[in-house]
């Protein structure tokens, strides 16, 4: 005998809630990765600065100003796009952009060749939070949105803390290539 009526409706609602929480967990993992990535350049400063012949000012620009300006300004633009475009595709674009340019920064030979990818990494990472917040608002009722946002933002301290063992693991590997962020 098949289920019908209230039982079927309750099962469908339960499955939908499970998907909502799975999306929340995935978005939180993306946020963790966002903050791990953001911290790694500073973690490798003792290797990158001499390797690229950077001054302290140049390195400060790479880890601060160049990234933050693009991240902050583009965050406003990406928030607008998140309200208008297909959010999962926009998030995938941001992830691909920041991941690809993080990898490309490993080929940097000096300040300018590291500066350009860092600016664009800021653009890619700026997609994550406004898009995630819009996706969460679509999936969670207003009475649960505070919990969902709090869970998502838990990724910030976890990502910062996780960057330390990640950088240590890379530093203990036998090849110089692993140092590139």
Task: Put a short name on every predicted segment.
Residues 53, 86, 107-112, 141:
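Helix-breaking motifs and short loop linkers at transmembrane-helix boundaries and internal kinks
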């Amino acid at each position: 005998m098949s289920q019908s009526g209230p039982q079927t409706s309750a099962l469908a609602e339960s499955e939908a809630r499970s998907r909502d929480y799975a999306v929340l967990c995935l978005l939180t993992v993306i946020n963790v990765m966002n903050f791990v990535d953001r911290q790694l350049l500073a973690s490798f400063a003792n290797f990158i600065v001499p390797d690229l012949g950077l001054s302290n000012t140049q390195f400060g620009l790479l880890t601060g100003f160049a990234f933050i300006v693009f991240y902050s300004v583009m965050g406003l633009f990406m928030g607008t796009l998140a309200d208008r475009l297909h959010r999962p595709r926009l998030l995938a674009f941001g992830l691909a952009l920041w991941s690809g340019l993080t990898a490309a920064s490993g080929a940097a030979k000096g300040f300018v060749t590291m500066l350009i990818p860092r600016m664009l990494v800021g653009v890619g990472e700026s997609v994550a939070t406004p898009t995630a917040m819009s996706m969460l608002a679509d999936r969670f009722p207003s009475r649960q949105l505070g919990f969902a946002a709090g869970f998502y933002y838990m990724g910030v301290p976890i990502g910062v803390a996780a960057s330390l063992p990640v950088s240590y693991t890379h530093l203990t590997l036998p090849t110089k290539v692993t140092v590139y962020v």
